[in-house]
Amino acid sequence: MAISHNTLAFTFGMLGNVISFLVFLAPISTFYRIYKKKSTEGFQSLPYLVALFSSMLWLYYALLKKDAFLLITINSFGCVVETIYIILYIIYAPRDARNLTFKLLSAMNVGSFALILIVTNYAVHGPLRVQVLGWVCVSLSVSVFAAPLSIVAQVVRTKSVEFMPFNLSFTLTLSATMWFGYGFFLKDICIXLPNVLGXVLGLLQMLLYAIYRNGGEKAMKKEKKAPIEPPKSIVIETQLEKIEQEKKNKDDDNEEKDKSEEPIGCGV
């Protein structure tokens, strides 16, 4: 007996929900460290703002489409989780990073989303409204999937996969495959199309990982084998050490002085 398209769409959608659920929870360790250290440690808020914006758009699209319940479940969860991440970031970020986050949040997640709401509710009507919103979602998803191309270029240039973990590439490829299947059997090109690009780029990343996974180790071995030049003069080295020690002692004194002048409990 042949399996219906609705059954296959539900199966792929459920698997997509499970995998995307894990992807949304992946930054928990990062934000736990931020919470423990009370510092964002140079992390950027843009990826989480974009993820929230994407979840908001896909949730709105699913509500208008009315037959994409599994898109509603995962993107509702995504909106909640990404909002929590952003709140934690704002609490512990330095002033400049916090101000930039507020500006991006206002421009993208509030301003742009409000503009899309106005256009899709007053400028276009009926089936055209869903189509316009769908292609907006496609454009955003394509730009998000294309973002790791800079990492791909870095891997090819450095022949090292240090900044492209295999597990993440594999998970995102699997997620794109599941959502492509969901869109394909649901006969929704707006869901399926961007995930074709996502899967292709994911496979490319895994291929590069297989090619360059030993690149970093070879570079380290090469550095270890490089001959170490002996010091030209023990006398000169000793004199330099004395100068460095005197400089260090002077810097330590200045540092202690600076610490004593630092205001206690000053808000960032």
UniProtKB/Swiss-Prot annotation:
It is found in: Cell membrane. Residues 1-7, 64-70, 125-131, 187-190 are extracellular. Residues 29-42, 92-103, 153-165, 212-268 are cytoplasmic. Induction: During nodulation. Residues 234-262 form a coiled coil. It holds the Pfam family MtN3_slv. Residues 243-262 have a biased composition (Basic and acidic residues). Disulfide bonds: none annotated. InterPro entries: SWEET, SWEET_rpt. Residues 243-268 are annotated as: Disordered. The keyword Methyltransferase does not apply. GO terms for cellular component: plasma membrane. The keyword Repeat applies. Residues 10-96, 131-214 form the MtN3/slv domain. Its main location: membrane. Keywords: Cell membrane, Coiled coil, Membrane, Repeat, Sugar transport, Transmembrane, Transmembrane helix, Transport. PANTHER family: BIDIRECTIONAL SUGAR TRANSPORTER SWEET15 (PTHR10791:SF222), RAG1-ACTIVATING PROTEIN 1 (PTHR10791). Mediates both low-affinity uptake and efflux of sugar across the plasma membrane. This is Bidirectional sugar transporter N3. It comes from Medicago truncatula.
